[in-house]
Amino acid sequence: MIYYLSCTGNTYWAAKQLSEATNERMISIADAINDKCICHLRDGERLGFCLPVHGWRVQPIVEQFINKLEIHASNETAHSTKDIKNIYTYFLLTAGDSCGEYAEQLEQLLNDKGLSVKTECSLIMPESYVGLPFMDVDPALRETE
């Protein structure tokens, strides 16, 4: 299962690539946050998060979602229905340049939830953050690199 948050489409694209490569389901955090946030993992299913880096830290919606998330795994996936630390948990971050402390903050949130992150990675995407006066989006030539 892949939970994702996408604002400009970059992270949606990355999550879709992962979903197609792994045959894992995709669920939008923006849609799921308004429900009960219950995750039922199938036998052998992994738990992934694809998230955009904005301001080099975890967004409040992501923190709220993880805190609200209730995880139920099959015995085969978790080796025990109460022991979720054995679930293969990973995350992929998309960023225009660097991730700052996002990875460390996200891993701590997941650890606090009882999950143990097995893999984390980042993917540099076209720059789309314009929240500060000195930051500009990438020129067209850079986007094609």
Predicted regions and their residues:
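FMN-binding flavodoxin-like domain, especially the glycine-rich phosphate-binding loop
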Residues: M1-I2, S6-I33, C37, L41-E145
